[in-house]
From Swiss-Prot:
HAMAP family: Ribosomal_uS2_B (MF_00291_B). Keywords: Ribonucleoprotein, Ribosomal protein. It comes from the Bacteria. GO terms for biological process: translation. The keyword Ribonucleoprotein applies. This is Small ribosomal subunit protein uS2. Gene3D superfamilies: Glucose-6-phosphate isomerase like protein, domain 1, Helix hairpin bin. NCBIfam families: rpsB_bact (TIGR01011). It comes from Burkholderia cenocepacia (strain ATCC BAA-245 / DSM 16553 / LMG 16656 / NCTC 13227 / J2315 / CF5610) (Burkholderia cepacia (strain J2315)). The keyword Kinase does not apply. GO terms for cellular component: cytosolic small ribosomal subunit. Belongs to the universal ribosomal protein uS2 family. One of its GO terms (molecular function) is structural constituent of ribosome. PROSITE patterns: RIBOSOMAL_S2_1.
Length: 246
C-alpha cells in the first residue's frame, strides 16, 4: 500500500535535528527550520521513498534478500517485527563488525547457534549438570540476541535497509565495499553519501521508523505476490495454448 504525505506528517517524518548539528550535504532535502529544528521537505521524501519501495518490490520479485538494520532502542522491535513479517533477515541488537565483509566467520557462529538449538530440541539440556546447563543457556541466549535475525541468511544480502546511517556507519561501509545497494533513512545531521536509495527523514521517532519499516516490508510482500501471480498467469497461458492445439 502506498504511503501518503499525511501519514508522513502524522509520523513526524519531517522533523530533522537541531540546526547546529546539520550536515550541509542534506541541504537539498531541507525545507527550512522552525524553533532551531530543521524541517525536511516531504515533497522530496515521498517520491524518494516511493522509488526505494519500487526497487525493493523488484528485488523481492526476483527472490532477492534484503537485510533490515536498526539497532537503536526505539527501532529494535519494529525492525524485527517487520523483517519477520516480510520473511527477511535482520540485525536489531548490535552490528558485529565483519557481518558482511567476513561472512565466513559469521557462518561459523550461525552453525554454532543452530547446533545448540538442535541440542535443546533433542533434550540435551536435561543430561547436563545445573552449571553446564546454565552456561549453555547463557551462550545460546547471547547468540540468539546477536545473530538470531540472520541465522537463515544463506549468504551476503542483495541489499540492506538501514534506519540511521550515522548509527550504522560500519554496516553502510561494509555494504559499499561489497557493492551491496543501500536503502537508508538519512536525517539532517548525517551525510547521504554511500546510500543508493536515500530516504530523507526523521530517524528517531518510533512512529516514523514504523512507517518506513512497514512500507519496505509491504513492498517486499507485494513484489513476491506479483511474481507468484505472473507464474500462475504464465502457467494458465500455457494450458490454454495446449488446449487450443489439442
Amino acid at each position: 500500500m502506498a504511503v501518503t504525505m499525511r501519514q508522513m506528517l502524522e509520523a513526524g517524518v519531517h522533523f530533522g535535528h537541531q540546526t547546529r548539528f546539520w550536515n550541509p550535504k542534506m541541504a537539498p532535502f531541507i525545507f527550512g527550520h522552525r524553533n532551531k529544528i530543521h524541517i525536511i521537505n516531504l515533497e522530496k521524501t515521498l517520491p524518494m521513498f516511493t522509488d526505494a519501495q519500487k526497487y525493493v518490490r523488484q528485488l523481492a520479485a526476483n527472490r532477492g534478500t534484503i537485510l533490515f538494520v536498526g539497532t537503536k532502542r526505539q527501532s529494535r522491535d519494529t525492525i524485527a517485527q517487520e523483517a519477520q513479517r516480510a520473511g527477511m533477515p535482520y540485525v536489531n541488537a548490535r552490528w558485529l563488525g565483519g557481518m558482511m565483509t567476513n561472512f565466513k566467520t559469521l557462518k561459523v557462529s550461525i552453525k554454532r547457534l543452530k547446533d545448540m538449538e538442535a541440542a535443546v530440541e533433542a533434550g540435551e539440556l536435561e543430561k547436563m549438570s545445573k552449571k553446564e546447563a546454565l552456561l549453555f543457556e547463557r551462550e545460546i541466549a547471547k547468540l540468539q540476541k546477536s545473530i538470531g535475525g540472520v541465522k537463515d541468511m544463506g549468504g551476503i544480502p542483495d541489499a540492506i535497509f538501514v534506519v540511521d546511517v550515522g548509527y550504522h556507519k560500519i554496516a553502510v561501509t561494509e555494504a559499499n565495499k561489497l557493492g551491496v545497494p543501500v536503502i537508508a533513512v538519512v536525517d539532517t545531521n548525517h551525510s547521504p553519501e554511500g546510500v543508493d536509495y536515500v530516504i530523507p527523514g526523521n530517524d528517531d521517532s518510533s512512529k516514523a521508523v514504523a512507517l518506513y519499516a512497514e512500507g519496505v516490508a509491504d513492498a517486499i510482500l507485494e513484489g513476491r505476490a506479483n511474481a507468484v501471480n505472473e507464474v500462475v498467469q504464465a502457467a494458465r497461458g500455457d494450458d490454454e495454448y495446449v488446449e487450443e492445439n489439442a
